[in-house]
Every structure is written in structure tokens, then in C-alpha cells.
Amino acid sequence: MKTLSPIYLASLYLVLACLFWAGNFIVGKAASIIDIPPISLNFYRWFLAWLVLLPFTCKELLIKKKIILDNIFLFSILGILAVSVFNSALFYSLRHTQVITGVLMISTVPVMIILFSFLLKIEKTNFFQISGVFFSLTGVLFIITKANLNNLLNLSFNKGDIFALIAMFAWSLYSTLLKKRNLIYLQFLYYRSL
């Protein structure tokens, strides 16, 4: 059997990550149409993830029990931000706003990660990151306003947009705090899904 090159595998995983992220928004919107409560959708989604990960992580979790106990506070905060706040706020927002609006707001997460990393002194900010922030925000504003300044001045937010912003802040803070520790990611993902 032919093995896949690391570059090919990395590219494949990046494409799959994008598909899963997009699927999260589509499933969230579909669930809102058939009236599945956001909290229920979030619970069942992560319960299923917990069950799927159990056979792959159980042994390692027992071996790494000390690492988990030493980081229990951080793991709990990360779990609350990523699982509870982000997903519940995102699914709730999709009940009241369009998928494209939610995706556009979430696309500013890298900008917020840079900002949180700077504010929490986790990572120094450089010229390229500042340039990226500028171009990212410009692009998002360009799309949201359809390149019309009047649209920006008359911009109004609905309940869904506010919850999309909450989701964006939660995921940004989660991603920033995740940089603080070198974690065994599969086991952390399992613990986080609890």
C-alpha cells in the first residue's frame, strides 16, 4: 500500500476541517428550521463526539491523569468557551440570522486571536499580523457593506448577529488560551467534550 506524503495529508486535513466547519453552520441552520433547541443540538453533538473519541482516548487519559488534573482549571475554562458558549451561541444565532452573516462574523476570529494574544501577552504582534488584521477586517467590511459606505453607516444588528459576536469572542479567547499550553490534543478534545 502506498503511503501518503505529509504535505498531501496536511492538505487533506485542512480541507476536511473547512468542510466540518461549514457543516457545523449548515447543520445549525437546518436544526433551527426544524426547531431543535440550540442547547439540545449542542449537547447531542458533543455527546456523540465523546462516544466516538472514547475508545481512542480512554487508555491515554488514564496514563496522563496527572497532566489532566494539573490543568483541570484551564481545561474546564477551555471546555466552557469552546463547547458550551461557542456552539450554543452559534446555534442560537443561526435561528435568527443568515448562515452567510454568521460565517462572515466568525471569519474575523483570526483577528480577535491576534488581539487577545497581544492583550494577554501570550504572543508578540508583528507587522505582518497587523497587516493581515487590516486586510481581513477590510475584506469583511467590504463584503458586509457590499462596498457601499452608506450600508456601513446604516448597519443594524439583530439578535442572531449579537449571538454570533458572542460565539466569535468565545472561540477567539479559547484559541488564544489554547496557545498557552502544549496539550495532547486528542485527549484534550475528549475531556473538552465532557
Predicted ranges, named:
Residues 16, 43-44, 78, 105-106, ...:
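Hydrophobic core positions of alpha-helical segments in small-molecule transporters
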Residues 40-51, 87-127, 167:
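Specific alpha-helical transmembrane segments that line the substrate/conduction pathway
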Residues 18, 46-50, 107-111, 133-136, ...:
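Residue-level recognition of pore/gate-forming positions within transmembrane alpha-helices
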Residues 34-35, 96, 122-124, 182-184:
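Helix-loop interface residues and adjacent transmembrane-helix termini in multi-pass membrane transporters
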Residues 20, 24-25, 54-101, 105-106, ...:
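Specific transmembrane alpha-helical segments of multi-pass solute transporters/efflux pumps
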Residues 53, 125-147:
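Hydrophobic transmembrane alpha-helices of multi-pass small-molecule transport proteins
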Residues 1-44, 153-180:
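Glycine-/small-residue-enriched transmembrane alpha-helix faces in small-molecule transporters
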Residues 13-14, 75-79, 91, 103, ...:
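Residue-level signature of transmembrane alpha-helical cores of multipass secondary-active transporters
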